[in-house]
Amino acid sequence: MDTTLSPAVEAEQIADSTIDTVSRLIAGVFSGALTGIFAMAGAFTGAVTGAVAGRAAQYGVLRGAALGAVAGAILSVEVLEASRAYWYLELSGSRGPSSMADFVEQLFRGRLVDEQLMSTMINSHHWQLRISDVSYEEREDVYGELEARGLSGDSLRKLPCYIMSSEMVRRQVTHCTICLQDIKTGEITRSLPKCDHTFHLVCVDKWLIRHGSCPICRQAVKD
């Protein structure tokens, strides 16, 4: 039996394949552009906030703006990526009862000025005030210890995070050992890759910024 496709069918298949490829290319370009816009907007907002905080703390507007720009860009990209995951769950019907406002609030709560930005700035200002009292070698030891203590924003962004689905909740009893609350459907969580311990994203990120190890088993998150 001859299974050779007619020229018309072959042309139709080629056209469909071309349309699919072009559609994916356009979607990729749009996604990249949107991510860039979010990052730029977050960097600008963070830079303004950081500059104001830097002036108030008397350790430099430029340094505060630089720290704020980095933190703002990271936060904006995290919001965009998490929002995509949220809408995917919305379309698949596996989203929990939490609203979009609650969802975004989890990302913003304590992530920009209160934690990452202000904690870094205050520690920096504290050690700058005492810098004249120590030798060069002691300075290197102090700053090396502070740098190694917690994770950077880039390292945090590389750790896996996901939204707790109703199926995951049914499959396992999960609670956050940092805030001592159960992890509910629709909440954003982060799982540490080496030990697989899971926590609320906001809770564990606050911890990792200061410590860089698992709160339960104390295993280092990075090598």
Curated annotation (Swiss-Prot):
Keywords of the record: Membrane, Metal-binding, Plant defense, Transmembrane, Transmembrane helix, Zinc, Zinc-finger
Pfam families the record matches: zf-RING_2
Segments forming RING-type zinc fingers: 176-218
GO molecular function, one term: zinc ion binding
Cellular location(s): Membrane
SMART domains the record matches: RING
Alphabetical list of InterPro entries matching this protein: Znf_RING, Znf_RING/FYVE/PHD
GO cellular component terms, semicolon-separated: membrane
Spans through the membrane: 25-45, 60-80, 93-113
Domain of life: Eukaryota
Membrane topology of the entry: Multi-pass membrane protein
GO BP field: defense response
Keyword Methyltransferase: no
Induction description: Up-regulated by chitin.
UniProt function note: May be involved in the early steps of the plant defense signaling pathway. Does not display E3 catalytic activity.
Membership in a protein family: Belongs to the RING-type zinc finger family. NIP subfamily.
Protein name, as recorded: NEP1-interacting protein-like 2
Organism: Arabidopsis thaliana
Gene giving rise to this polypeptide: ATL24
